[in-house]
Amino acid sequence: RTAAMRDVRKIISEKFDYLSRRYLLEAIKAQEVIPHIREHLAMGRKVVVFHDYNKGGGFNPFDLSERAIDAEMSESGDAEAINGIIREFRTEFKDLISSDLFKASSPITNFQIEFPGILLVNGSVPAKVRRENVAKFQDDASGPQVILVQAQAGKEGISLHDTTGKHQRVLFNLGQPTQPTMAMQQEGRIYRMGQVSDAIIRYLNTGTNWEKWAFATTIAQRASAAENLGSGEMARAIKDAFISGFEESGDYRAGMEGEGKGGKDRDKAANDAISEYDR
């Protein structure tokens, strides 16, 4: 039975690989962030949402069906034992199998339904239309607005910051900041010289053990790589900022006290720690 249990775990893990998990996490976050976006729109703000993948969406890796097992492809070679465990699993975890959690659509599909007329910036959108979408977002006359930006397409070359003070900017990142330098570029779309209101930046966190593991391992490795490439103290500050942000995850609602505050103070403290040699 132990070998058959390992076979079932292998079946699930093969269905639920790294990329599939990232798709699912992003789909869940896209669904959960919708009420937060609506709150900010109601306050007259313009909202930027970054996502990692154009495709994706949820699926249920735990919806297992009985199957014919190739003895050479399994550790136990016992189809009856494997299918027996699958039947037990389906009975004990029927609520998990039927959960709506796994039915979420990709961010693009979901947002096009929830926010008709949403502005898109991604590789599937012609360059001319992307420029028009950015211009419309930046136009105060368009009012509170949502723009959905795919990470690679929007990491540089576009400005989405508030230059007039009429519509404060909010940025939600549905992906994981697995590339610190890219995350900095994304934040720079609304947080840069010339902004006249505080930029509000939020990273979504599902709180799952898998996301904690993915965040901890990837950020530690890549931020350290940036450090080793010569960024020194500043790279360490970037890594610390991401870690503290992840640890401080919470249900921050629109309009809360201190919203959009504190980032510059942290940046200054990090900058003050840099030696003249590092400068």
Question: What are the language-model segments listed below?
Answer:
Residues 1-64:
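Conserved helicase/translocase motor-coupling segment
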Residues 3, 8, 28, 76-80, ...:
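Alpha-helix boundary/N-cap detector
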Residues 7, 19, 97, 146, ...:
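Residues at structural and domain junctions
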Residues 12, 21-28, 69, 86-89, ...:
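Generic hydrophobic, helix-prone segments enriched in Leu/Val/Ile
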Residues 63-117, 250-257, 266-269:
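Low-complexity, serine/threonine/proline-enriched polar segments
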Residues 74-94, 151-158, 228-238, 266, ...:
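Short, surface-exposed, charge-dense and proline/glycine-enriched linear segments
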Residues 85-225:
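Conserved RecA-like P-loop NTPase helicase motor core
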Residues 178-278:
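A conserved SF2-helicase RecA2
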